[in-house]
């Protein structure tokens, strides 16, 4: 939908040529202004961007570290990864390490932050900080957190329903991994599991078996670090 001079293009050969067939090539396109926005932010921080990667590709590489921590062969098994972000939630379905289905949902942790801001009459930055520390009035858990947890579990179930109704050849999901900031809400995994009926775990790219050694500070935020882990090995794999 955009002129070629307004986009950045790159490609990758994803499959070798079989007898009598052509190579499989993946082409990625992104508007130049989006790439320029990212590089400008890095320049403000005194950094120079060598590579601007695609989030999905970074998640695919990061998923490999998480898969290595599960302690069993995942060959032929369907594993869903649900990333609860600030403004949206992304569900990707992996089979043999490759994404065969993906969908974004309009749900994220900002909903809870806005509810905190509105209920207690504070600004957004303070609401976000208090959400992370949990230093809120006693009625917070019953009035705000519990309803959000239920809404989050319903969104997970909704995402799984869409996933299973898509025509991608997979009839059931073997496990659901959750990540992102909201995945750190206490007892979130078992609540989601009760809604989706699929074994649900918190994704941790630093757990034993991943091959990554992280500092205690970084490990505290493990469910938020899958994409970062994938970015870190860009070009190294």
Can you say where each PLM-predicted feature lies in the sequence?
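Active-site neighborhood for divalent-cation/phosphate handling
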Residues: 1-67, 175, 205-211, 224
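Glycine-rich phosphate-binding/hydrolytic loop that grips phosphoryl groups
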Residues: 58-61, 183, 201-237
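Glycine-rich phosphate-binding loops at beta-strand->alpha-helix junctions
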Residues: 148, 171-201, 206
């Amino acid at each position: 939908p955009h002129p070629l001079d307004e986009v950045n293009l790159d490609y990758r050969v994803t499959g070798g040529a079989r007898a009598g067939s052509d190579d499989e090539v993946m082409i990625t396109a992104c508007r130049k202004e989006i790439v320029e926005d990212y590089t400008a932010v890095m320049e403000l921080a005194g950094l120079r961007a060598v590579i601007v990667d695609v989030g999905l590709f970074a998640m695919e590489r990061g998923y490999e570290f998480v898969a290595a921590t599960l302690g069993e062969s995942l060959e032929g098994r369907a594993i869903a990864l649900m990333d609860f972000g600030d403004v949206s939630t992304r569900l990707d379905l992996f089979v043999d390490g490759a994404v065969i289905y993906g969908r974004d949902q309009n749900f994220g942790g900002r909903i809870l932050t806005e509810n905190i801001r509105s209920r207690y009459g504070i600004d957004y930055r303070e609401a976000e900080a208090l959400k992370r520390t949990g230093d809120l009035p006693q009625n917070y858990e019953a009035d705000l957190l519990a309803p959000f947890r239920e809404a989050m579990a319903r969104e997970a179930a909704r995402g799984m329903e869409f996933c299973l109704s898509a025509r991608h050849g997979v009839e059931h999901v073997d496990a659901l991994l959750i990540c992102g900031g909201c995945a750190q809400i206490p007892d979130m995994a078992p609540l989601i599991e009760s809604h989706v009926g699929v074994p649900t775990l918190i994704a941790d790219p630093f757990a034993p078996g991943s091959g990554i050694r992280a500092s205690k500070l970084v490990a505290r935020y493990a469910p938020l670090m899958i994409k970062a882990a994938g970015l870190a090995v860009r070009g190294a794999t």
